Amino acid sequence: MAISAALILAAGKGTRMKSALVKVLHELAGRPMLGWPLAAAREAGAGQIVIVAGHQADQVQKRFGADAGIRIALQEEQLGTGHAVSCSLDQLDGLSGAVLILCGDTPLLTAATLQRLAAEHAASGAAVTVLTAKLDRPFGYGRIVRDSEGRVRRIVEQKDASPEEQAIDEVNSGIYCMELEFLRSHIGRLGSENAQNEYYLTDLVGIAVAEHAGCSAVVADDPDEIMGVNDRVQLAHAARVLRQRVNLQLMLAGVTLIDPDQTYIDADVQVGNDTIIWPGCVLRGATSIGSGCTLENNVRVSDCVIADRVQLKAGSVLSEAQVAEDVSVGPMAHLRPGSVLQAQVKIGNFVETKKVVMGTGSKASHLTYLGDAEIGSDVNIGCGTITCNYDGRHKHKTVIGDGVFVGSDVQLVAPVTVGANALIAAGTTVTQDVPPDSLAIARTPQVNKTGWCLKKRDNG
């Protein structure tokens, strides 16, 4: 069934989160909470997306407003779900047919469930179709009241429910599929004569029944899908469920997770088959990992492109880096933004790079800082080497040609260029360009004072 649009209600502040950030922008598995029902609606086939924002609407606009398929409606005063929907209808001018109404704080909702909801809506011919769930502890949710034949008659909110109604275990999810024509013509009939003095969208169910327009229902297979996130405990639970879903899909696609419960992978991360990921790894953002890679314990990767057969050894941290095939990084290495490692590069323990291009086969095996540098192929960077790229005001570039050998404890004071196949002696501070095929040595000559230590001891 075609879905004309989806309305996502996201105007609430989320007081129980006890946060300066509006609830729906809290992150789960690499996306803001609101991004999850939005993605589900799109995958289910919704055309236009309308977000109803209220608290921190400017932040919601900043995060989602640049998307051409999303419109933002403003609910300046929060007077209930019915009022929220009424604030959004002018964004749907010119549309007809079915519309999904979702909650911005239900990140576990899936596209498959929305498709079931839309299919039932089309098959039943009802004006309103509601997604429900059966809960062992339904406190706080609106209850689904059915007649003796099992037909939905109305939804009663917790604060307005009688003791008998509170005993009902089938609850309203706050998620609906409605006919736009019915919604437009009846939203103005909602009243606020209830315990919360709000305009309940749920009252449209009773109106639809009373006018014989029809109300249908779909029971969610997994009650977790309708869970609203209202505090940090529920946020952690939802994040755990999403992480399990992400990890399950990766394992089914041929990725080995040694301990899935201790592996944290954002939803938009891509990982190739035959890659092995050890516990404690965190993969974030728009990261892409190739096939046949190994990520040892406690590796963190954010917004990186990693090619095939790369070894990321324990404790390494990579951010906004590009790593070609057959590269080895770590252990305990740090690739900062702008690091580009070409094929067969080796970055060893306690090596830090930033804004560096390292050519094919080059190595920096130990205890090195490389920043603002262009390094050719088959270069050896000795232990303790530093590119001195910052003069206190500006950054400067170091260029090292192909085949250069840099000895241990070398400082390259930028801007400086080292020509191809040159050799920099250990302990040298390079302050001038080095011609190709040359030896550069700049250190005080060694002086041995024979017997000096004996004299020092004898003199006390």
From Swiss-Prot:
Catalyses which reaction(s): alpha-D-glucosamine 1-phosphate + acetyl-CoA = N-acetyl-alpha-D-glucosamine 1-phosphate + CoA + H(+); N-acetyl-alpha-D-glucosamine 1-phosphate + UTP + H(+) = UDP-N-acetyl-alpha-D-glucosamine + diphosphate
Enzyme class: transferase
Keywords from the UniProt entry: Acyltransferase, Cell shape, Cell wall biogenesis/degradation, Cytoplasm, Magnesium, Metal-binding, Multifunctional enzyme, Nucleotidyltransferase, Peptidoglycan synthesis, Repeat, Transferase
UniProt xrefs under CDD domains: GT2_GlmU_N_bac (cd02540), LbH_GlmU_C (cd03353)
Self-association and partners: Homotrimer.
NCBIfam families named among the record's database cross-references: glmU, PRK14354.1, PRK14355.1
Protein name (record): Bifunctional protein GlmU
Species assigned in the record: Trichlorobacter lovleyi (strain ATCC BAA-1151 / DSM 17278 / SZ) (Geobacter lovleyi)
Lineage of source species: Bacteria, Pseudomonadati, Thermodesulfobacteriota, Desulfuromonadia, Geobacterales
